Amino acid sequence: MQDSIEQYMQKVGQQARDASRVLTSASTSLKNHALSAIYTALENNQAAILAANQIDMEKGRSNQLDSALLDRLELTPARFKGMLQGLKDVIALVDPIGEITDLAYRPTGIQIGKMRVPLGVVGMIYESRPNVTLEAASLAIKSGNAIILRGGSEALESNKAIAEAVKHGLKVAGLPEHSVQVIETSDRAAVGHLITMAEYVDVIVPRGGKSLIERVTNEARIPVIKHLDGNCHVFVEAQADLQKALPITLNAKTHRYGVCNAMETLLVDEKIAEVFLPHIAELYAEKQVELRGCPETHRILGTTVKPATEEDWYTEYLGPILAVKVVSGIDEAIDHINKYGSHHTDAIVTENYTLARQFLARVDSSSVVVNASTRFADGFEYGLGAEIGISTDKIHARGPVGLEGLTSQKWIVLGDGQIRQ
């Protein structure tokens, strides 16, 4: 079986590399034609795709997947409509490929500039969410990259159904069907091969829990753009407008629990904790959110709060649980975020411009937010159309990774017979 998995992955890799050589020079109109054909194929096959998703959901329930995982797995008609809208948005995006920037003459008479080009072949490993299959595929096609998708075994039927529509659209447009491939085995050995096939794959994008990210980081022989967990914070500073702070902190936690940009720890300045905490605790109680707090939080709110442990400050709950800490001010809040956070998305609520600027400068996260919910940390909300992930790395791409994050630049030199003296 091991040999057959290796042979299968080698074939997938070779097909992706061959497809990437065609895609890299595909015109914008051809790529958009393919994406439009994919849109039509998805529309025509909505019932079949949702039925495939229900098979995954039934398996998930029988395997006792937790509610957060099931929420991410489910494709409702509304979410399917959102997927289609995301695809429309990608079609409307400006194609970055071939763009030449920084063109300038040198004293020798040559012109030097930079041209934006595809990365080549992207390998993506992700869990649960079948909508990621379409988002990643559409961004890869638009940016001229081939992509190999390894979704979670819990979403295999959904991913295969979506991939069929994608293949149909590529075929209609005359682009290689293997530009987008879903690995159709749940064997974990496939991941091991994917992250070490340097001859075929140019970059790996893992989206998932710490164990997945650690495995990929430790074993990959290919550059990695990590999408780590989202241990996000909101700090309600002493000069916050509480009419803003209440809806922001409620939305950041309860809008959707099982997403990486949901707040997991609430930090409150000690100067307003006595006033603010009882109000927000009442709103959380209505949503049945369990609070785990520091001793000062417990003193203010009483026995409705469970004691927080050191582990709670590090935890991405992905559910109706929230850690709460009262801090002495902005310095302690920033220190806490930089120590316990995952460098994903963190927010401050304040009317003090100087402190807001300080927070923006000192918090070491891919997205830093002032007076808004952490839930805005998303490629669609940032105007990227869709995202392949939210990078918590600092090299190449950081934050939501859209079209430009799937490209690099090469130097171009334009001459008229010049030789080096």
UniProtKB/Swiss-Prot annotation:
One of its GO terms (biological process) is L-proline biosynthetic process. Coiled coil: none annotated. Pfam families: Aldedh. One of its GO terms (cellular component) is cytoplasm. Its main location: cytoplasm. The keyword Zinc does not apply. Its EC number is 1.2.1.41. It catalyses: L-glutamate 5-semialdehyde + phosphate + NADP(+) = L-glutamyl 5-phosphate + NADPH + H(+). CDD domains: ALDH_F18-19_ProA-GPR. Keywords: Amino-acid biosynthesis, Cytoplasm, NADP, Oxidoreductase, Proline biosynthesis. Pathway: Amino-acid biosynthesis; L-proline biosynthesis; L-glutamate 5-semialdehyde from L-glutamate: step 2/2. Signal peptide: none annotated. The keyword Oxidoreductase applies. One of its GO terms (molecular function) is NADP binding. It comes from the Bacteria. It is found in: Cytoplasm. NCBIfam families: PRK00197.1, proA. Belongs to the gamma-glutamyl phosphate reductase family. Catalyzes the NADPH-dependent reduction of L-glutamate 5-phosphate into L-glutamate 5-semialdehyde and phosphate. The product spontaneously undergoes cyclization to form 1-pyrroline-5-carboxylate. This is Gamma-glutamyl phosphate reductase. It comes from Acinetobacter baumannii (strain SDF). The gene is proA.
